Amino acid sequence: MVNEGPNQEESDDTPVPESALQADPSVSVHPSVSVHPSVSINPSVSVHPSSSAHPSALAQPSGLAHPSSSGPEDLSVIKVSRRRWAVVLVFSCYSMCNSFQWIQYGSINNIFMHFYGVSAFAIDWLSMCYMLTYIPLLLPVAWLLEKFGLRTIALTGSALNCLGAWVKLGSLKPHLFPVTVVGQLICSVAQVFILGMPSRIASVWFGANEVSTACSVAVFGNQLGIAIGFLVPPVLVPNIEDRDELAYHISIMFYIIGGVATLLLILVIIVFKEKPKYPPSRAQSLSYALTSPDASYLGSIARLFKNLNFVLLVITYGLNAGAFYALSTLLNRMVIWHYPGEEVNAGRIGLTIVIAGMLGAVISGIWLDRSKTYKETTLVVYIMTLVGMVVYTFTLNLGHLWVVFITAGTMGFFMTGYLPLGFEFAVELTYPESEGISSGLLNISAQVFGIIFTISQGQIIDNYGTKPGNIFLCVFLTLGAALTAFIKADLRRQKANKETLENKLQEEEEESNTSKVPTAVSEDHL
């Protein structure tokens, strides 16, 4: 056994009672747990460390049945599984593959316009279809996640991603643009099975001191795919006039992504499991105990929309992520506008934005695990995103590409670094509601604003230039920063973990006092 603070590495099959683990003051659980009369723990009942009471007996609200058929074998044991990093890395990789396919057309927008003989708006829709399909499919897929679990959703998403990649190989003629649209639509459906999973994987597989880092790693893959999507297509597909030669270069890109998608599907089948044997945190253990097999899915959504803090986060997250989607889709067009013939550098600027954002995401995830300052960190990152966007807006047309690289990278560090922050903040604000539902609603907001911003900014750029188009985004980022300031730091998951620890310590103290009293009486009697 390897002690990891509040968790233990699962190195053998011998369970370790929760009472044997160290208390972590940074760990958190839903505030209603301590005040609900049927949830509070009776301090007069002593629980021996070697036979910890089942959490369903300690924290079972009335009317909720413990899902013994779906939860881990013993909820009184808190352990993390060694498989957890393999699971999150495989997920991160196939998420990367899917996001690459999202941006591979937009990063060389002008080349695909020439090859297929279509308008820039038609190529933009190959990106926006990802956003459009997500909106109606999110709630059904979130329901499937609750009904069938992580493994089924992972297999479905990876399989659809692989299928879409191979369908695109049938579109290597200029008149076959509809085929590439079909392939992209299949990949966009796969994305619905991917985007809502990072926070769920982090909660189900990782300990309380690892969840933010794990969520950042899961989101990291999506951002890496976008980065590669900016870098690789301009290199593999040069801007040439001969369409036959262009088809050859496009086929190389499509074959590579098809092979990678197939390999990742095989890895998902081998590596991805539904859940670890034991819950990795006290909050997750209690979440199993609080879960009802008859819980209303629509009721959960209704409760989320009654949570004002979460509603504000949904709006602000959508504004930030939507601005990122619009910038990513239109970046090639904006750079070529001021720097003709610089398709490769346009891709490199996109790469710089995303790589900087990946660094920001990892740093923010580590910082959250240590500080738990969700509201403060989110607000600071949002304000810096606005500052970065303003600087980028007024330096894009200066005629110096190296300046654009610096300002775009600074903006990306905060803009894409914000994305995992939003997921984790949402889980804190909505615990013990499903992470899949909360993160899914965030993503719906992002897709809606992404479509609106992409179409609007594209029209503004075509009619008035890049600066007015970017100022348009700055206005909405200002609104998002202002609304973020009104979100209260109601960290329910943190409170729940803390209260569970306090109740446990109180139990042990009562047990200790109870065991000492008979001894004292016996000595007096003698």
Swiss-Prot record:
Residues 1-70, 500-526 are annotated as: Disordered. One of its GO terms (molecular function) is choline transmembrane transporter activity. Sequence repeats lie at residues 25-30, 31-36, 37-42, 43-48, 49-54, 55-60, 61-66, 67-72. It comes from the Eukaryota. Pfam families: MFS_1. GO terms for cellular component: endoplasmic reticulum membrane; membrane; mitochondrial membrane; plasma membrane. GO terms for biological process: choline transport; heme export; transport across blood-brain barrier. It catalyses: choline(out) = choline(in); ethanolamine(in) = ethanolamine(out); heme b(in) = heme b(out). Residues 25-72 are annotated as: 8 X 6 AA tandem repeats of P-S-[VS]-S-[VIAG]-[HNP]. InterPro entries: FLVCR1-2_SLC49-like (IPR049680), MFS (IPR011701), MFS_dom (IPR020846), MFS_trans_sf (IPR036259). Changing N222A: Reduced transport of choline and ethanolamine. Belongs to the major facilitator superfamily. Feline leukemia virus subgroup C receptor (TC 2.A.1.28.1) family. This is Choline/ethanolamine transporter FLVCR2. It comes from Homo sapiens (Human).
